[in-house]
Every structure is written in C-alpha cells, then in structure tokens.
Amino acid sequence: MNDLATYNFAYLDEQTKRMIRRAILKAIAIPGYQVPFASREMPMPYGWGTGGVQVTASILGPDDVLKVIDQGADDTTNAVSIRAFFQKVADVAVTTRTTEATIIQTRHRIPEEQLREGQTLVYQVPIPEPLRFLEPRETETRKMHALEEYGLMHVKLYEDIARNGHIATTYAYPVKVEGRYVMDPSPTPKFDNPKMHMSEALQLFGAGREKRIYAVPPYTEVVSLDFEDHPFEVQKFDKPCALCGAENVYLDEVVLDDKGGRMFVCSDTDHCEDRRAHGHAGAMLAPAAKESQEAAE
C-alpha cells in the first residue's frame, strides 16, 4: 500500500482544499468581494494566521518555494512557526528571499521588492469587513456592499480631518478595488497601499476566524479612499534606515537603551540584508564598514 494514500499534503484534506479553491476562484472573479468559506480548525489559535495558512495550504504545490513574513521580518515567532509547519507537513522549499519565492504569506506588510508575475501574496487577515467598526451588524454591511453605499466610510475619514486636520488612519486604510468594492487591505500600514495597485502578483486574503476569503487579481486597480482637497498620502520618515541607509521604505522604531536611545530600521528584513550585502551602510553600520574597508586596503 502506498503511504501517500493516507497522507494529506500540506495538512488539509483534498475535499477541504477543493472547497477553499472554489472560494478563491470566486474571489478572483469578483475582486474585493468577501467570499464565505467553511474555515477549518488548524493547529494554531485563531488570530495567529489560520486563514492565511488555509489559503496557502490549498494552493501550495511540491515545486513551490515558500516565504513567510511577520510585519516584514522573516525571523519573528509567527513567521518561524508557520514556515516550520509547512516544512513539516509539505516538505517544500522555503526561503527568506522575496525574489526566489513563488508564494509569500504575510502578516501586516507587503515586501519592498516589487512582486512579479507568477508570485502569490497571501495575507493573514484578522477582520475582513472594512465597515465593522462603523456598522457592527453583518446583515447591514452586506447590504451596504451590495448597494455600494460607502458614505459611512467617507464620513469616518472626514471626521479624521475635522479632528486632526488630516486623515489620521495609518493602517488598515480602506481601498476601492476595480471601482466597485471597498476592501480592508488587512492591518498593513497605509504606506503599502500603493503597492497593491496594478501589482503583477496575485493577492489573496484569508480570514480564518471570520470565515472569509477575498482577492485582488494581477493588474487590478486599487485606489485608497480620499478627498480632492485631502488626497491620500503615505507616511514619511525623517531619517533613512540606520543599518542599510534605505530611503522611501517603511521603517520600524527600535529602542536601544533606557535613556531614550533609538534607531529606525527597515521593516522588511530581506530588503535590508540585500542592500547591506551590496555594500550599502546606514549610520549605525557606517563606522564599522569604513574600518573593515581600511583593514582590507
């Protein structure tokens, strides 16, 4: 008897994968629309990426190369545990390089490296409904999506302007997909929103606890909501990355000591490591880089 006959590749059984793939196909056909699916119990608690893991398990093949990131980093707890999980249940190749991966599962970030055709970005989504905190009743939000009644969302953004003088929302910033559905891009910083627009990669969103899947196909128009007199703007950082000197990237603040010392470094660890490998150095590494260069000479 073949041992593979009783083995489920990538943990989920084939009937479950088929059901999730049907939901994915419907989501791709209707960009931004939340497709219900029968979420399964996974060997991790809800809120730790069960939706993204189920989507990844359903599309993962033996020849795929998997990359998992958590807020841009490859070495954080969530990323390491999910990567180890798929290595164990699927024995697929894994990588930390964005350019080498065919499937990238992410929590709260989009890689700085521009994604290409053939790649798939799988988002872990805690709350898929962009109107949830404005209208908690699911029956009402479904009607609002069906009738394209998104005035409430614009009122929320206007209230930001009235209170703060600008739109203060910095993450989970709502977008309109292909001129139709308003979508929650998951709690990614609004810095990443422009990367979703006309991306060459397929973007899939899985919410396990909420039992929803939605998608943005390649080359799809994704526009962040704004006003003519208050256009959408991304966050700006005053300093470059302290390790690689990169500018125009999303930075994380790192506390260095208990005296107020801090530095800002690339959220995307692969992007930062790649730049340093090519000789770039930020303020924190510049002295060490200079010393090593002088020693080599």
From Swiss-Prot:
It catalyses: alpha-D-ribose 1-methylphosphonate 5-phosphate + AH2 + S-adenosyl-L-methionine = alpha-D-ribose 1,2-cyclic phosphate 5-phosphate + methane + 5'-deoxyadenosine + L-methionine + A + H(+). The keyword Repeat does not apply. GO terms for biological process: organic phosphonate catabolic process. Its EC number is 4.7.1.1. Its cofactor is [4Fe-4S] cluster. Binds 1 [4Fe-4S] cluster per subunit. GO terms for molecular function: 4 iron, 4 sulfur cluster binding; alpha-D-ribose 1-methylphosphonate 5-phosphate C-P-lyase activity; metal ion binding. Pfam families: PhnJ. Keywords: 4Fe-4S, Iron, Iron-sulfur, Lyase, Metal-binding, Plasmid, S-adenosyl-L-methionine. It is an enzyme of class 4 (lyase). InterPro entries: PhnJ. Disulfide bonds: none annotated. The keyword ATP-binding does not apply. Belongs to the PhnJ family. Catalyzes the breakage of the C-P bond in alpha-D-ribose 1-methylphosphonate 5-phosphate (PRPn) forming alpha-D-ribose 1,2-cyclic phosphate 5-phosphate (PRcP). This is Alpha-D-ribose 1-methylphosphonate 5-phosphate C-P-lyase. It comes from Rhizobium meliloti (strain 1021).
